[in-house]
Amino acid sequence: MTSSKSVHDNYTITCRPFEEDSVKELVKTDSRLSNWPVVYILSSPKEVYVGETLDYDKRMRQHLDNTQKQGLQVTHVILHEKFNKSVCLDLESTLINLFTGDGQRKVLNANNGIVNADYYLREHYRRLFDDIFDNLRRSHKLFSHSKSDIENSDLYKYSPFKQLNEEQKSTVTSISERIIDRIANDHSDLLEFIIEGGAGTGKTILAVYLMKLIADYGSGYTIDDGPGPLAEDNLDFPSVIDRRHLNIGLVIPQASLRDTIKKVFRSVEGLDASMILSPFDIPKIVLDR
């Protein structure tokens, strides 16, 4: 592929082959790629990974050594003279959800918790994000659908990478810490949580979010594989997690919602449509054990 660079409103999007020599040459062109907050995208026609880092050079070398990233072919790096850590975390989360909603590539990110945190001039940067999305779609062909179409899709609505408000963050933290502690200590007795709320209060979104979080724990992801500060601030994740097989499932009575969530799970690494169950599947699972 040919390399490219686009410049817009004080930010640049640079595209290079995801190869050691190509990344080395790119880093030589701008010293900030070794000491500046950036957002980057690694992609192939079927997969995508989004990250943020203060040291793009070092992070790319880590990814190039990661066998899970060897199928990725292209790196895009988004650089702005006024980016900071908070802006990059927000843009990273925004792009991950948009890629999930677009549905054209499997999203490889883990979910270590994404918090809907406010920061200085957030609305200004959010308008900039719209421009960045348009350029990634039109100039770099990374998205197939418009932003409005994506945001109105079920894939976007039920993305497991949704940003959490403070109440949701507290609920997820309380539940996931206790579940992961029990898994780590091989406890198998019943543990019940009841989350109450009317229609439209986000119960399904929380369930999908927790499924991804627990699946990533069992897959042996490290903290660096996923976006967001929740794990750093609250969740007691070890920095490196032992890989273990977990039988996890989400029981959904409504057939139409089951079909929708299955589509979401097919588009996200670590999740699988077979994890979505009807109430009638439960006796079969019990008998098979």
Regions of interest found by a model, annotated:
Residues E47, Y56-K141:
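Structure-specific nucleic-acid interaction/processing domains
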Residues P160-L191:
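N-terminal pre-P-loop "Q-motif" helix
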Residues E192-K212, L230-L257:
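Conserved RecA-like ASCE P-loop NTPase motor core of nucleic-acid helicases/translocases
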Residues L213-G226, R244:
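Post-Walker A helix-loop "phosphate-sensing" segment adjacent to the P-loop in P-loop NTPases
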